[in-house]
Amino acid sequence: MAYSIEEEQEINQLKDWWKENGKTIIVAFILGVGGMFGWRYWQTHQAEQIAQASAQYDTLINSVQQDEQAKKANIEQFVQANSKTAYAVFALLDEAKKATEKQDFSAAEANLNQALTQSQDEVLTSIVALRLSAVQFQLGQLDNALSTLNQVKGESFNARKAILTGDIQVAKGDKVAAKNSFEQAQQSGSQLEQQMAKMKLNNL
């Protein structure tokens, strides 16, 4: 169960966006930090933290000399040190991807559950929730998979959410509900998603 092309593109776009814009993100409560000096201090501090996390993430992910056990330990340390940041979520998504490629869905579920608690971004949360729901579906956790999809927000995810919902409903034996879900995907999806939904409708 590989990541879809759309998910890969969205994750890579988010990574690039954070590298370019993360250090200039303005948080509303910072307006009360204490005048211009406080703002400048906070902005400099945040920029340094984000730049450091970005560099550490690149080093961690691109390391080819470490064995898997050592790399896993380093990723756990990185996530703990960079808790609640996008880079912690990216690291956990990478781990979940490797686990699914090995069909170790239990490990993938653990990584994605952790990523979901770390994410502070709606788009990133939606991507993680889609992946987690798909993994729970693979594990036969059908009710959990449907529940997880409630955390997927935004119109751009509607078709993928509807297709996965339909797959789960088919597995639960509810073909009427599945038909409605696949038809919804046909109305809101890209050309590829529409074709996928049509194929699933034909197979009902």
UniProtKB/Swiss-Prot annotation:
Signal peptide range in chain numbering: none
GO cellular component, one term: plasma membrane
Periplasmic side: 43-204
Membrane topology reported for the UniProt record: Single-pass type II membrane protein
GO terms assigned for molecular function: protein-containing complex binding
Subcellular location: Cell inner membrane
Record's keyword terms, sorted: Cell inner membrane, Cell membrane, Chaperone, Membrane, Transmembrane, Transmembrane helix
Keyword Chaperone: yes
Cytoplasmic domain ranges by topology: 1-23
Summary of subunit composition and partner proteins: Interacts with the SecYEG translocon. Forms a complex with PpiD.
Name of the protein in its database record: Ancillary SecYEG translocon subunit
Organism whose genome encodes this protein: Haemophilus influenzae (strain ATCC 51907 / DSM 11121 / KW20 / Rd)
Highest classification ranks of the organism: Bacteria, Pseudomonadati, Pseudomonadota, Gammaproteobacteria, Pasteurellales
